[in-house]
């Protein structure tokens, strides 16, 4: 039996802001429990829902040196889906209205504390992992501290680490002097071949340099980040580590995302009866959002953070043109103010065609996946993307730009061979996107049989966590022996 510890800043169902939480909540329970004892460690945020806090059981506490002070570390645990979750408690660092704040140096101090506390807690918990699986820059100091401070202790000797990059754009950077003072790391670690990047300290870079293996969340993104366009300044380091770098696609939780058992949608359906049943979700959503009730009208869904990365500048450029077509567009998400206001404006201008829900709601997202005919994701870059996997699961055909995980998961429609599970375009160009949407409209309206055959294919593809878990298990066995 091999012991594995997942360390992350969020995880479903305890706390979630994005796709990282889905991975941390789903992957451990899909690993083979006959071979692995997998546990998860998270911060104990004050903003966790009360029902989640009620599940936590106090274990013990201790003090550790951090940022020139003796800091309190409280330990809690909970059982969820047969997995043990541990929580690091410190009210000074983890009391806030949201899991993350907008102050970069405070974030570095909080998650530097978390990284050191994770390692300090292990002997107290009596759990010695063979491997610690770290996620994103918030845990980037775990491999560094392990080598710098803990490796001399017999308990820690030989523990391996994996660093998973969910989005290379976020790296945890700040000036070296402040980071050195907070973390207590010596000058030795702040050189260009270690944590230093352009005269700043970079926590994700530290994790990539010191981890025994590096993964990211799709094979295409693993190749893209070795190039200057996608590499965010770390492409040279990632090329140097390419022997230990692999891309493993995320999956989705089929217990949560399955149209035949989804408690949020008015008309459940499956791969056999979707031709009759799926459309009932569309008419229900049209009524709920005040759109023109027309079951034949093509509905395009968007569920996303409203940011530049997601390609909303392309949509802004052609939205007026698109609204001249026989389509309805339903949007759910929050993000940059200009995009929130843009969708509010179009919802006002084209009230019977466009609905903008500027919020986040699990229930509405499920309703949009089920009701829409197509799902638009024109991302500038997309490490993996979960929304297109959910759309595929619900028989809603994705229209995507060929980048990262979108390229790996959506097979473009080929009318001559009768293959494909969606539509795609290659260049980051608004009119190329519009042409692709209009091509999809043409198939939807004029070749409905082909469209439905594509839905047959999308609903048969397996993007459950089972496949991804097998790939992770291969990597764990490579690092720590089967």
Predicted regions and their residues:
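Catalytic cores of nucleotide-sugar-dependent glycosyltransferases that transfer UDP/GDP/TDP-activated
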Residues: 1-482
